C-alpha cells in the first residue's frame, strides 16, 4: 500500500483529500501544522508528500527545505522524496520555474480539482521517476 503525507493548514481541503485517497487505497498521514510535520517526517516512509503551497506559519517551499534538512540528518546525504504542492491560487509556472527550477508543472495541483483527476495526478507522480 502506498503511503502519503498531507501537510496543509486548510483543514477542510486536507480532510477531503485524505478521504479521497484512503478510498483509493492509500495509507494516509494528515498533519495540519507544518511545524509538527517537520518533527514527524521520516525519510523513506512516504511515497509522496502533499504540501499546502500557502500556509499561515510557513509556505510549502519553506517546509520542503526543512523536510530536506531532516532527510540529510538521517544518513548525512539527503534522501530524495517526491513532493507535490497544493494551491487554490492561479499558478504562474514561468515565475516558479525561475525561483524553483527543480519543480516542474507536474509538482503542483489545484485545490479545485475533481476527485478522479486528483487521484490520477497523485498516482502519476508516485509512478514517475521525476
What kind of feature is each model-predicted range?
Residues 30-48:
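Acidic, metal-coordinating helix/loop segments flanking the phosphotransfer/catalytic sites
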Residues 55:
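Receiver (REC) domain active-site loop signature in two-component systems and cognate sites
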Residues 32-33, 59-67:
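Acidic catalytic/metal-coordinating carboxylates
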Residues 52:
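Active-site residues of response regulator receiver
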Residues 8:
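Conserved acidic carboxylate
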Residues 11-29, 103:
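Two-component/phosphorelay signaling modules centered on CheY-like receiver
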Amino acid at each position: 500500500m502506498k503511503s502519503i503525507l498531507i501537510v496543509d493548514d486548510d483543514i477542510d481541503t486536507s480532510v477531503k483529500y485524505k478521504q479521497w485517497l484512503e478510498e483509493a487505497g492509500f495509507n494516509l498521514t494528515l498533519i495540519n501544522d507544518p511545524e509538527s510535520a517537520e518533527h514527524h517526517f521520516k525519510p523513506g516512509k512516504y511515497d509522496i508528500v502533499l504540501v499546502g503551497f500557502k500556509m499561515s506559519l510557513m509556505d510549502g517551499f519553506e517546509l520542503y527545505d526543512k523536510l530536506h534538512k531532516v532527510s540529510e540528518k538521517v544518513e548525512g546525504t539527503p534522501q530524495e522524496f517526491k513532493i507535490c504542492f497544493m494551491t487554490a491560487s492561479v499558478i504562474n509556472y514561468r515565475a516558479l520555474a525561475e525561483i524553483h527550477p527543480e519543480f516542474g508543472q507536474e509538482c503542483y495541483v489545484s485545490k479545485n480539482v475533481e476527485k478522479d483527476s486528483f487521484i490520477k495526478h497523485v498516482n502519476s507522480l508516485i509512478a514517475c521517476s521525476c
